[in-house]
């Protein structure tokens, strides 16, 4: 076993990396409220795992979406638990994100030289809300359908480009199969990649600049 570790150590310098991670200075003013961002990340990882599990059974069609969710809840082993954890974790992620934003704002974490960290955080907040909007529609029940109809119709109030944006969100002039396909694609592919990229940038900035000092 030691030989295997030595082989990886020689090539990856695992010990040096571990020392760099564990020896990072933590200011004395840091308290439990500074963990809100990390809790948000944990919620996202739970979302990713449970969401990935449900993709094995969910069918993104207007005729089968609701019945596939019922199948997950009633027939799949622990399916009810996986979907419930996905829903609870989604709510917790949004709550933790909001509290994290308030903490950063109230402690001045957005000030120079951390402007880019703040901007990337705001983008992450928008992506998180987008996860909620797209995921809410996937069961394609009455609540999800009318939520999509309302949300996709809001941009129509924008002059000149409003109708174009709404048609882009719906995949046409009305809510239907194209809409569900787009929301499913966004929820399971586009948004996860976007949030991964901005999370990486966000964490690299925090790693580079450290935690902001007390007010």
From Swiss-Prot:
Membrane topology: Multi-pass membrane protein
A matching Pfam family: Cytochrome_B
Cofactor: binding comment: Binds 2 heme b groups non-covalently with two histidine residues as axial ligands.
Membrane-spanning ranges: 32-52, 90-110, 116-136, 186-206
Primary residence: membrane
GO cellular component terms, A-Z: plasma membrane-derived thylakoid membrane
Residues involved in heme b 2 binding: 86, 187
Essential cofactor(s): heme b; heme c
Subcellular location: Cellular thylakoid membrane
Positions contributing to heme b 1 binding: 100, 202
GO terms for MF: electron transporter, transferring electrons within cytochrome b6/f complex of photosystem II activity; metal ion binding; oxidoreductase activity
InterPro entries: Cyt_b/b6_N, Cyt_B6_PetB, Cytb/b6-like_sf, Cytochrome_b_N_euk/bac, Di-haem_cyt_TM
Keyword Metal-binding: yes
Domain of life: Bacteria
One Gene Ontology term from the biological process aspect of the record: photosynthesis
Residues in coiled coil: none
Other observations noted: Heme 1 (or BH or b566) is high-potential and absorbs at about 566 nm, and heme 2 (or BL or b562) is low-potential and absorbs at about 562 nm.
Record-linked HAMAP family: Cytb6_f_cytb6 (MF_00633)
Name recorded for this polypeptide: Cytochrome b6
